[in-house]
């Protein structure tokens, strides 16, 4: 669902008198439109990037580029992840110089086993397709996002994740 759809759902819940103890939302809801909606007070939002509300040089750089390219677009976690991917591409492509080919780029990307995009997010291992187990929760208070957990940094305990085995990429085709 989109942020707008979720805001509409939260409005409908309020009208119906339904007030759950916890509203726990995923990272795509780290969007000023949710916080300023007037119906998300107290909602928790998971993120795996540095909060926009806290000082961070890498987030400042993202915001500078967003301002140049975005035409007034608000920063979002998904935007930060896209920016990180672009930085990773630029780093590896730049290191190849005149040897930039598709195969060399893929080989170069598989060699990157620690990537934090200069501090945009906790380090992860894109070369081996291994995400980190780090989380950070924000909470909507007074129409703004504030840090809820942990007090600083990220919680990077492996207990934050669960291993699920199986091939979830194949959808059976009905005949």
Predicted features and spans:
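A short linear-motif detector with a strong N-terminal bias
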Residues: 2-4, 22-25, 114-118
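Stable alpha-helical elements in mature extracytoplasmic
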Residues: 2-9, 55-62, 82-85, 92, ...
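Residue-level detector of functional hotspots within protein domains
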Residues: 8, 29, 121-123
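Extracellular/periplasmic periplasmic-binding protein-like sensory domains
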Residues: 10-83, 152-155, 167-174
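Segments of small-molecule ligand-sensing domains
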Residues: 68-79, 90-149
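Sequence contexts marking disulfide-bonded cysteines in secreted/extracellular proteins
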Residues: 133-135, 155-159
């Amino acid at each position: 669902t989109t942020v707008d759809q979720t805001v509409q759902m939260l409005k409908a819940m309020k009208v119906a008198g339904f007030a759950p103890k916890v509203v726990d939302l995923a990272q795509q809801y780290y969007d000023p439109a949710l916080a300023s909606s007037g119906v998300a007070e107290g909602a928790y939002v998971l993120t795996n990037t540095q909060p926009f509300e806290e000082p961070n040089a890498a987030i400042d750089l993202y915001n500078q580029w967003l301002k140049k390219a975005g035409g007034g677009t608000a920063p979002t976690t998904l935007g930060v992840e896209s920016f990180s991917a672009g930085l990773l591409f630029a780093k590896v492509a730049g290191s190849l110089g005149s040897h930039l080919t598709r195969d060399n780029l893929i080989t170069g990307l598989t060699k990157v086993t620690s990537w934090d995009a200069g501090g945009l997010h906790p380090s992860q291992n894109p070369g081996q397709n291994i995400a980190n187990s780090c989380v950070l929760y924000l909470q909507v208070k007074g129409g703004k996002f504030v840090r809820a957990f942990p007090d600083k940094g990220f919680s990077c305990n492996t207990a934050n994740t669960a291993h699920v085995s199986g091939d979830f990429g194949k959808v059976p085709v009905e005949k």
